[in-house]
Each structure stands twice: as structure tokens, then as C-alpha cells.
Amino acid sequence: MEFVVSNTNLRDLSRIFLNLSRIDDAVNWEINKDQLILTTLNSSRSGFGKVTLTKKFFDKFTFHPDTLFLTGFVSPTVRLSTQIKPILSIFRNKIFESTLLVNNNLNTNAGAAESSSKKNVVVENIQMQITSGKECRVIFKFNCKHGVVKTYKIAYEQTQTLHAVFDKASCHNNWQINSKILKDLIEHFGQKTEELTIQPVQGRVLLTSFTEEVVHNKDVLKQPTQTTVSIDGKEFEQVSLNEGIIITLSLKEFRAAVLLAESLGTSIASYYSVSGKPALFTFNKGKFMEIEAQFILATVMGPDDFDESSLGARWQQSGTANSSLLVPENTSAAPALENEAPSASIGWQTNGDAETSRMFHSTLDIPRNEEPAAKPSRQTTDEENHPLFLEGMPDETELMAFDNDVADDAEFGPTQHEQTYHGIFSQDDTET
């Protein structure tokens, strides 16, 4: 199997991996004859990210089913999993080596002409190949000008992937906004802030975070801090919200969705029903939707949730409206909203055969005696002990450094315009 990504889409691909790494340290690949799907699920099963790249995203898309994958039979879909940190290392190592060569040449009197040529060296395309057999690797080949080829190999393991079952048509609260506006607003919240509350109030939407008192090592915050930013209703391209519905979710995963949408230059849309039920954040890029992303996050259930008296006016506004419209909520509609909420819950199902698949259902109350599902053991080889095969989540400093390098590096070409989470997934032992 071989996939070729042009210089034009290289930056988008790097940002996809970067923001998926904010959710978990592993990324699942699902490949069929029409598309490549990248997914990641965090350890607490409270956040999920999915990015679909269609054939039109690639300059070349060659898919060959492998008889050695999973079932032992020819399958129309290939599924595998890789650590995401080595993939980030590939891009960062390439950027670092390129910058180092330029800086060294600038420090020599005789190397001015050579450094100028180095600056003009760009990656023309990337070839991604997947091999099986004795050497199971995902191979990245960076084809640069002047015949320079940089090759990196990442080990993978066979896996079963999960896909969301989310009925956004049943979500009565939704909005859409330019992701650049949202990115500028969430920069007011600290990197270590865990939660974010979204609340509509009188034609505006409030984003609120609360940081408790912290006295730990070098982190000292003597007083609790609450930060609130307000979004005017006119900033939304479309909005339809019940003012009594307030949701609280993880800021880390929410930030990943917003930053990816902003880097792609798209608007981001959100769908949710009530607090305690998952929220969907989605966006796409391209005339033919070459890139489509979905982030599904668990929300925290507060003590006053599902209180009919808390439902206020319903606020609706479209992009063509000159002003927001406040519609008094029909008192008989509140119970209906509560009754319909469960249909907006999210489930997960493996993509295996129907007779062997399992369903993972949304839940917020996990029995105390239930142990979280352990990750499958991972076999390692001597080659995987190489520094390139690093495991674990990259910290925020590494992610910011990578993001800055991608933004500044000429090789990427032009920019294209725990309150505790119980988790939204618990495994149902009954096979369907």
C-alpha cells in the first residue's frame, strides 16, 4: 500500500498528527479503497478524535488488501495502530536537521551561497508505505528537491478500531463559529486548566474555567481563579441553544479540536443535548471534503442537571439574521427534550465482523468494583528500543515547540487557507 501527500497538504497532515497527540499517545489507522481514517481515544475513554482523509487528499492512493491482517482472509479494510510520538519525532527531526544545516552554513564565510541553496530545499511530497511480514512498518519517505530522500520507519501492531454512534439530529443545542475566534478566546485559559463550561446567557455564550488552589512543587496558586470570556451572538455563523443547558467538558480535548480547525482554516460546529451526555465538535475542509474531523467529548453531570425549571428561553440565530431571536420555550417542550436526550448518547462498535463485534455504550456512572479495561500488551523488538520509538504522551512544551516549528519552517510550503470524568465508554460483556 502506498499513499503520496503533496507539499501543499504536508502542513495539514502534520497538524492532524499534532492535535490527535493531545488526546492519546497512540493513533489507529483504518484504510480502505476510498479513504484513510485516523482515530485516537484517551485512556479514560472520555475523549475521542477522528480525522478522515479521502482519496482526493492524496496525489496517489494505492490500496491492496493484505491476507495476513487480523482475520487471515482478504479484508476490504486494513487496521493498525502506531505510537504517535515517533511520528511527531519524524517531523521535528526533519525540521531540526534542516535548520541546523542553515545555521552552520551562515556561520562560515565561504558557505553563504550553499546556505542560500539549503533554504530553497523543500519537501516535494511524502510517500507513506505499509509493509507486512517479518518487518511490519509504516514507512515515511520525504522526497526533497535535489534528489534528497529522508526515510523513517515506524513499527505498528494490528488492532481493532472503535467508531462512534452519535445521532446529532437528536441534539437540540448546536452552534457554528469561525475557529479563529474560538482559538483567540481559549488562549485566555491556562495550559493546565482542566475543565471548561459553556453557558448561553441572553444572546451571548460564556466560556468559564475554574482553577482551584494549587501548592505543588513549583506550581503555586494561593487563591482559586475563575476566568470567563464572553462571545457575542453576532460572532456565530449559526446558533440554536436553550439557555438553561450548561455543559462542562475537558479543556484539553476541546483545545485540540479548536486548534486543528483553526490550522485548517475552517469553521467548527458543535452538537449536544444536555449536560452529562457527550458533545460532538465537527468540521471539514475542501470542496470535496478531503478532510473531515470529529471530536466527541464527555460532559460532566452537575447536581442541578435535568431540572425542568432550569430551562430558559431558546435562542436561535442564523448567519443571515441581523439580530438574535429569543423565543420563549414552550413549557411542554422541556420534558420532551429530557426524554429525547438519551438518543443523543454515544456508543462505540468495533469494525470487525458482525458476529464478533462488541458495543461500547455511553455511561457516566461506572460501578466502583469495575476495573478500567487494560490496554493490550505490546510486543517490542530490539529495533523499537531505538530513541525514535518513544512511548508516552508528549508534554505541552513539546507540542508547542512542534507547532511553532511547523509554522515557521519553509520546508512545509505555503499555509492553506478529574470534578472526575467517569468516562463515556464502558464495555458491554454481551456480544452482539
UniProtKB/Swiss-Prot annotation:
InterPro entries: DNA_clamp_sf, Rad9, Rad9/Ddc1
Gene Ontology CC: checkpoint clamp complex; chromatin; chromosome, telomeric repeat region; cytoplasm; site of double-strand break
Gene3D superfamilies per the UniProt record, alphabetical: 3.70.10.10
Alphabetically ordered keywords of this record: DNA damage
The keyword Disulfide bond is annotated on this UniProt entry: no
Region annotated Disordered, chain positions: 363-389, 409-432
GO molecular function: protein kinase activator activity; signaling adaptor activity
Family: Belongs to the rad9 family.
Function noted in UniProt: Acts in DNA repair and mutagenesis. Involved in promoting resistance to ionizing radiation and UV light, as well as regulating cell cycle progression after irradiation.
Protein name listed in UniProt: DNA repair protein rad9
The organism of origin for this protein: Schizosaccharomyces octosporus (Fission yeast)
Gene designation: rad9
